[in-house]
């Protein structure tokens, strides 16, 4: 598996400035929880085994100072409760749900290349803030080639974005013969307006609702 491949490569680079933790995917879908992030790996439809990925960051409810005061929760515990900690003091237990409102909308990024349109992709991309999706073929008349090689056309990617109700989509993973993907974006935006051609070095910031966003 992956661990064997990476360890073989480390023969030529034995010293790394970071640790590697191997978590290999088992089955059609698997969820990994790590450091406040949720990574969902799901199988897609290509000529070889491939997975798409969604990264989710949850956002807790807003801290309610009025409720905290009404329940006489010591001020020194407010920040810890806001971070999700449970606190016990002299037989009294303070829990985050005592001072937090309903969970707020978090952040979701979905990334997928090397696949035909699949229901698993639509379901796992649902309501993503950003979908980075393969668009191998932009030119008309490439539908049969897309089916043969198990890739997507621009319009098929646009349909995925529309069905998944994502906020924004970037196309990527173009055919080497596609020199100017922007020339074919009209066929995409007719289906899903908030779509853009991805390019090397393109960046953005995904922010929680109510926070400013910058893109380049």
Report the location of each language-model feature.
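Short "lid" loop at the C-terminus of a central beta-strand within the Rossmann-like core
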Residues: 1, 45, 137-138
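Active-site HxH/HxHxD metal-binding segment of metal-dependent hydrolases
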Residues: 1-24
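Binuclear metal-ion centers of metallo-dependent hydrolases, dominated by the metallo-beta-lactamase
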Residues: 25-29, 117-216
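Short coil-to-beta-strand transition motifs
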Residues: 30-36
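Active-site-proximal loop/helix segment associated with metal-binding centers of metalloenzymes
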Residues: 37-111, 115-124, 130-132
């Amino acid at each position: 598996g992956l661990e064997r491949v990476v360890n073989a490569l480390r023969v030529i680079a034995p010293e790394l400035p970071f640790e590697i933790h191997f978590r290999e995917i088992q089955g059609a879908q698997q969820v990994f929880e790590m450091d406040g992030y949720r990574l969902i790996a799901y199988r897609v439809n290509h000529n070889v085994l491939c997975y798409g990925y969604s990264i989710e960051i949850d956002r807790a409810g807003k801290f309610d100072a009025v409720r905290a005061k009404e329940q006489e929760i010591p001020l020194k515990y407010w920040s810890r409760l806001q971070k999700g900690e449970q606190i016990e003091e002299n037989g009294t237990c303070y829990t985050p749900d005592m001072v937090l409102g309903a969970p707020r909308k978090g952040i979701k990024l979905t990334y997928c290349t090397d696949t035909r349109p699949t229901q698993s992709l639509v379901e796992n991309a649902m309501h993503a803030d950003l979908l980075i999706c393969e668009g191998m073929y932009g030119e008309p008349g490439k539908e049969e080639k897309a089916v043969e090689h198990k890739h997507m056309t621009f319009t098929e990617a646009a349909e995925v974005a529309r069905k998944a109700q994502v906020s924004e989509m970037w196309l990527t993973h173009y055919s080497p013969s596609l020199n100017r993907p922007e020339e074919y974006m009209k066929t995409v935006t007719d289906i899903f307006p908030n779509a853009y051609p991805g390019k090397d070095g393109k960046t953005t910031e995904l922010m929680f609702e109510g926070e400013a966003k910058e893109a380049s």
